[in-house]
Design a protein with these regions (language model features):
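Glycine-rich beta-alpha junction loops
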Residues: 7-8, 105, 184-189
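Active-site phosphate/pyrophosphate-binding segments
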Residues: 169-205
């Protein structure tokens, strides 16, 4: 299985359940929700210790959905946040191949926040460089203090779709026909989508 995790940007949503996309791809996300509707109180000081967030990353692997031999793409343009690094490290420890999508030019200038002192590109098995500049945005506009249009989003989409095209080519060369989603906007779109999804579950790709 190919899992896609992205730290709050578009990589996972761009690739999952798209017309022309592979049914074998699985988006990965996790969060901790706490509902406790008491009266409003002053905000507590932020807790920067990583303990709790690391424990729920451990739970991601306890669910047995990510297994040795799977591939995990981890997208983070800065590559410095603790959860991203911890996810990559734990995935490798569980036998997954971890591919990082990041910016070497940007990330290498940032201080890592993980206790290991590592950035994403320093812990993964393979690095895909989206070549976003420091600060990510690339377009200068008169009258604005900061640039607009983050390069990482455009680069990530182009890189990932190119990889998917290459993957399809390689699979066909090996006699494997990958399950590809049609557009749901066709008259029979939903029926075909469910059919393709069931096919992918049965054969694994």
């Amino acid at each position: 299985v190919i899992h896609i995790f992205d730290s709050g940007h578009m990589v996972s949503s761009e690739l999952i359940h798209r017309a022309g996309g592979l049914a074998a791809l699985s988006g990965l996300s996790f969060k901790l929700d706490i509902t406790n509707p008491v009266r409003t109180r002053p905000a507590a000081p932020p807790d920067t210790s990583p303990g709790l967030s690391y424990r729920y990353i451990e739970h991601v692997f306890e669910t047995d959905q990510l297994r040795a031999g799977d591939v995990l793409f981890v997208g983070s343009v800065s590559g410095k946040t603790p959860n991203v690094i911890e996810l990559a490290l734990q995935a490798k420890a569980h036998g997954l191949t971890v591919i990082g999508l990041t910016s070497l030019a940007y990330s290498s200038q940032l201080e890592p926040m993980h206790p290991s002192g590592k950035r994403l590109y320093e812990v993964v098995d393979l690095v895909l460089d989206n070549h976003a500049p420091y600060g990510d945005a690339i377009l200068e506009v008169d009258g604005l203090d900061y640039k607009i249009c983050p390069a990482s989003g455009m680069g990530a989409a182009s890189i990932m779709w190119a990889i998917m095209a290459g993957l399809v080519e390689e699979m066909l060369a090996r006699g494997l026909k990958p399950s590809v989603y049609p557009s749901i906007n066709r008259p029979d779109g939903w029926k075909l989508l469910n059919q393709i999804y069931a096919e992918a579950l049965e054969k694994g790709y």
